[in-house]
Amino acid sequence: MSFSQDMDNEYEKLIRRMNPPRVVIDNDSCKKATVIRVDSANEYGILLEVVQILTDLNLTITKAYISSDGGWFMDVFNVTDQDGNKVTDEVVLDYIQKSLGPEACFSTSMRSVGVIPSTDSTVIELTGCDRPGLLSELSAVLTHLKCSVLNAEIWTHNTRAAAVMQVTDDLTGCGISDPERLSRIKNLLRNVLKGSNTPREAKTVVSHGEVHTDRRLHQMMFEDRDYEHRLVDDDSSIQDERQRPDVCVDNWLDKDYSVVTVRCKDRPKLLFDTVCTLTDMQYVVFHGSVDTEGTEAFQEYYVRHIDGSPVKSEAEKQRVIQCLEAAIKRRVSEGLKLELCTTDRVGLLSNVTRIFRENSLTVTRAEVKTKGGKALNTFYVSDASGYSIDAKTIDSIRQTIGQTILKVKNNPQEQQQRQKSPSHESPTRFLFGGLFKSKSFVNFGLVRSYS
């Protein structure tokens, strides 16, 4: 670390000591949510850090009011637990107070929530072309190379796929440090990701540091330019347009702000996804509001680029819109949700995904976890040919894997009915609407040889 960086860090610490963050947790003023107020000295990226803390605790942010103009950061969040109730767990409340309050150091401890601790494991980051059977193929390669997958998250969007996997050696249960072995793992996985006829580059990165999985997946897909529109030959492109988020960008010239508004279906971690992307694109949120009404979410941000300027051109405007749309859609869980809970064993992920592939199912998103010798995996699957999933197919898969081990969270008939039902729009209401006058507000095929 350079002398100038040391001086910057000491200056930041001095500012925090002079202006310590203040956190107020209120369970009385709102009937349906816990209200969390955060006041602190303002610094770049602090909004994302706070939202990341709350999101990683599996809290749902139903409303938010953001103000960080000048040197002070003042935010209010209405949050609920996973069941839609106020947060009453004293352990969680104490953690919020310590993580966001005077004891917190935003540059270090706050990032420990939701982070993969990789001291005794190896983290593999993968980016490549999505296709039927990809997850099955990747996990088969890792099993062949005597690697166990402890935790993993896989996203697919717009013909691209990204994964962050935490692996260990089968025999030792520890991370893999042999350079030659790591090089072989990287090369074989890269060959799988390349496929046979894709011009796009495939990337594999191996590390031993701590990784915040969701943060990295957004960064990886952003760097891979998954937001760029691609031609699709089937009817999925029509359905994709129907589900497209409504994102608008307008300049408020009097105040040199760009006003970004987002309207889309509400879901967990939505605020994190949009704020994460704005931060990665180097935009600073000065004011904003977030509101949910029924199944819809409304977000409004008053932003400038980190250089102090609003959006400068039509091309930049379209890029902001495309990137926010991609950030929202990456985590949209398309397909049938399957949950697997069983005793963990070597090759489990490879075997399960092989069964999916053999039954013509493709994994659109997956979350793999191991805890206390148990495998807790969630898969979102769809028919590789684009048809509705036959209930008989699911029954057959469950019989093969185990009826009590693999459970269906939403059946194909219910899924199809929801897709056919029209969405009901609600009027947008924003906190700063009266104060600021703006103009408007895959597919996964088994390659037999991976070497």
UniProtKB/Swiss-Prot annotation:
Tissue expression remark: Highly expressed in flowers and at lower levels in leaves and siliques.
Annotated PROSITE patterns: ACT
Region entry Disordered, spans: 409-428
Keywords (A to Z) from UniProt: Repeat
Protein's UniProt keywords contain Repeat: yes
Any one cellular-component term (Gene Ontology): plasmodesma
Tree of life domain: Eukaryota
Biased composition (Polar residues): 410-420
Pfam families: ACT, ACT_6, ACT_ACR9_3rd
Conditions for induction: By the cytokinin benzyladenine (BA) and cold stress.
Domain ACT: residue ranges: 35-118, 123-200, 259-335, 337-416
Function: May bind amino acids.
Name of the protein in its database record: ACT domain-containing protein ACR4
Organism field: Arabidopsis thaliana
Lineage: Eukaryota, Viridiplantae, Streptophyta, Embryophyta, Tracheophyta
